Amino acid sequence: MVVRPARNVSGSVSLPGDKSISHRYAMLAAIADGPSRMENYSTGADCASTLGCLRSLGVTWERKTGAGNVIEVQGSGLALSAPSQPLDCGNSGSTIRMLSGIVAGQKFTSEMAGDESLSRRPMERVITPLKAMGAGITSQNGRPPLRIAGGNLKGIDYRMPVASAQVKTCLLFAGLLAEGETRIEEPLRTRDHGEVALRAFGAQLERKGNEVRIRGGQRLHGIEALVPGDLSSAAFFLCAAALFPNSQLSITNLLMNPTRARLLDILMQMGLRISVTRLEEVHGELVGTLQVEGGRLKGATIAGSDTAALIDEIPVLAAIAPYTEQGIEVRDAKELRVKESDRIASIATNLRAMGAQVEEREDGLKIPGGQSLRGTELESFGDHRIAMAFSIAALRAQGETLIRGSECTAISYPEFFSTLEGLVER
């Protein structure tokens, strides 16, 4: 994909359904009693991988024709059917990690596999606690494919060594299928879509600080839901607006979950003017409309709990860092090295290719501000967030930018480039 420089960004956008919520809704709909209907389900390949795995587990679902990307799922109750072939999770770490919690509670053996990228990603973070609950799991040195012998799980008390919403959700799902109570303590508060979705489907949970408890054996009911627009996808357009002082952007039906909305705080501190209108609660998730105007772009430091809250948005924030006045420093982000690519290295490599000075660290980056970037040939590294992040950086670069392997954006946002093109002014 070739991205040409722009002179402004303006318009209105409604985003595909939030990826994190779409995964969780589909998985819970599969083990609920009765039907569920999800409108604005994510259009990305990752969430399609979840649906494909559920079909292999005997779940009946249908994509309705027409606008809205509606998925209707007929729940199977807490018991699924043994798959006749390995569950293909594609590129989706969310699918393999969260669905493993449900598969571990079934009375059959499953194999969960993925593509080359997924097969390099660490899975010990779900293997260890699921084994402690009673599941039999083998892996390739802690990486996929996973062979999971499900069975009679027992609730556990588990302190997570790494803050991960995917792992937390996996264990909550397993806890729902276990005997007794499961207590999970996370080192830092992570996004709570798993807890919110479980409550929407009728489960009872208790949360106190960084601890959440769930009692096993609860039945779920189906729901009808409009999935809010994906805030991580909105980050790219928000950062595009931040690059141009006269930009004006409206984003409708946008997820405003407090555990995800730290991005908005950071961007406002950096100088982007954001106002929220028509805020409402839908199945426990806050949803609103944003009005956005550009301004002078200051710098930021992202560390500690902010890093955990912004782990998916850091690539695009880092990509625009050279254009800020003071630059951006990212710390405590070692987790970025085990995403779809080594995102710390990918960001540093591409920024240097565009002529920027970057200090790469083991757990982050320091990117000075006040720099100009030049258009050049960049690599996506097969990573959807890297491809989209540098498409935004390219809007202010001098000359055209070619992003190789940009088709990987289909993993989370197939319509990204057409949506972006509809907002830029040249």
Model-derived regions, located:
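Structural preference for solvent-exposed beta-strand-turn elements
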Residues: 1-426
